């Protein structure tokens, strides 16, 4: 391949050299830029004695006329079919009237004359040949569409190992066995174990699916083929299936090895009903993947690792055992995982002594591994921008704000009234969050514009949360209403600054009613059917599966939740107007305050949630009570279930 490329480039250079030589020969033949005279004028000048000599080449009609007092000769041309002497006689002159020098003909002159015609011809022929080769290359390129575009990485020099992956310990444990399968296949074959055909990595974007697959290849020390699912399908029919065959042929020749298909949902979506033919090419590609992963030839030592963040749209045939035997879930890391990830990404970066990675991990709930890597990188960029040699807490804290809300918009200048309204708006959020027991503690309040926001109030949960309760949602709704209510109380008007808060509150209230079953009137029911459309690759489309009367009740429940949240926020802010003003004035002065500065304004501690639940009975005590009841001949009756509010018993008529 490299040799053909060199020959092709060399041919282009040859054509260019021929063109340059042809131009040079043409220029030399024209004799440069000498002044040209008519021979009749030259004869008149000879008669007047102004010409010193005439120089010419034997066999040529071109002459050089040297005038007296001039350094450069002038060029002229003899009449056709006569020599210099005959031409002079035509004007009544002879060779005695002027000095004539005749130089012998040079062989180079004949060559130059020949090249004048040969080189342009060769140049045109070269252009034709070049165009023919380009056309041939286009045909070869069309044929090469069927070749796989997978990039191969050898396992001789692993760049990524399990030591570079943190925060996904369970996933690493699952994939350690894959490494052992590749390193010691006889260990499992002796027990009759079948080597897993494929591993599917499932998780949100940025959780380390691609990094983990590269670490598996680095640990196993085997070749690693990497390709994206979108690289299989092209505009030509059959290209996708051909590329799949070529990819697995390369993998079998380099076995044992790993084939990594990123974003497999691009070709692995569930096959439709076969009507219309809009997805036939993608389905042919998927069918070929199914055959290659578990067809008649199932003895090769090739393991397929695929990654996706849409497992719900994948074809069931792709997920069955024998193809993707294991599905490894990579979720966003918890606080311990975030700390481990921060330690990995802070290697080689000079951190100041006051940097606490544990505290940093606590401040970044919901961050993925990619977010944390970006955070550390942003902090390093900020430190370099400030000409510092180390990365401090200030840079890391600001990097968190940049990742969450975007960079500061220092060019955005607010009027004094808008700035004051923003301060009271954010103070309303912060005060309501501080006074409600089930709301998350306030970590930072700022009126500095970032991204699309004029200001923001950042709350920070005290621990990682995997479930939400109704009381937490209700307090969250009240916090959303805090900014809107504060503007109304202080300025007796409302602004567009609360638009996003109202939208988020409405969406949360709707989900509480229609998805989470948190409505007393409607009960624990889910409303809205998610229909899976086969023609769109199982795209989700929500349709109403309830009556207009129920839709009205849903709207009423949403309005009730929002109204209750509004009243709670209004009550809190009305009772603590002095605190609201103090927070707003502090924001006007400092623009940004943290949770400790906010707590310093209060004398009483922050209200804590009261845990209410049944007394915990240990299994042994429960068994003892059951035995006593059996001996007494009585069993403790089960409590009767309360009727659902929507299913109240009707009185007998």
Curated annotation (Swiss-Prot):
Cofactor(s) needed by this chain: Zn(2+)
Positions bound to ATP: 203-210
Database matches in SMART domains: AAA
Family statement drawn from the similarity comment of this UniProt entry: In the central section; belongs to the AAA ATPase family.
Region (Disordered): 604-653
Pfam families: AAA, AAA_lid_3, Peptidase_M41
SUPFAM superfamilies the record matches: FtsH protease domain-like, P-loop containing nucleoside triphosphate hydrolases
Compositional bias annotation for Basic and acidic residues: 624-637
EC number annotated for this UniProt entry: 3.4.24.-
PROSITE patterns: AAA
UniProt cofactor note: Binds 1 zinc ion per subunit.
Record text on subunit structure and interactions: Homohexamer.
Active site (UniProt): 426
GO molecular function: ATP binding; ATP hydrolysis activity; ATP-dependent peptidase activity; metalloendopeptidase activity; zinc ion binding
Extracellular side: 30-110
Name this polypeptide is given: ATP-dependent zinc metalloprotease FtsH 1
Keywords: ATP-binding, Cell membrane, Hydrolase, Membrane, Metal-binding, Metalloprotease, Nucleotide-binding, Protease, Transmembrane, Transmembrane helix, Zinc
Stretches of the chain found on the membrane's Cytoplasmic side: 1-8, 132-653
